[in-house]
Amino acid sequence: EGYDTNLIGNGTDATVVEADEFDRSFLHLHPNIACLISDDADHLDIYGTNDAIKSSFAEFAAKISDKNTLFIAQGIENINGTEVSVNGTAVINAYNLRFENGKRVFDLDFKGEKITNIKLLMPGEHNVLNASLAFAMAKTYGLSNEEIKSGLDSFKGIRRRFSYKINTEKLVMIDDYAHH
């Protein structure tokens, strides 16, 4: 939110892409670091079967040679990577979820390292999972815990993904292009 563009560049050698499986276009990417949030039966009009979707995700995951740089939400089966969970048992696990001063706050067990008081402006346990996956990728890229926490704390979300249009005591209107 607030950038008025879908591409932000500052001359670094990193590019962050939200890849969509809709038309199999994500199979044209060759990432060094990636995450898989879900392999649900979606876009059956394109894939035909759930098995075809899962095969596509497996093909994408196979492009990442170092499985230490592939992060997957706990529960995704038959793909090797580092599991991430919320209140789960993964090696990277968000826990102690709470609200403080209108923000979602949580702690993260990152492979035995306890990282506390990670703050998000966005509600929802699914956003804690998204933030945990983003944290794992950013840390793997070399950012410090404090740099990542600062970035998450200031991230306003993506336009039309649970965007408040009206937020008063009497009326709340949310624009959410929820296609899943």
Explain the meaning of each model-derived region.
Residues 1-3, 157:
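Short acidic loop-to-helix transition motifs that present clustered carboxylates
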Residues 47-54, 80-180:
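Adenine nucleotide phosphate-binding catalytic loops in nucleotide-utilizing enzymes
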Residues 3-77, 121:
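Flexible active-site lid/hinge loop adjacent to a nucleotide/diphosphate
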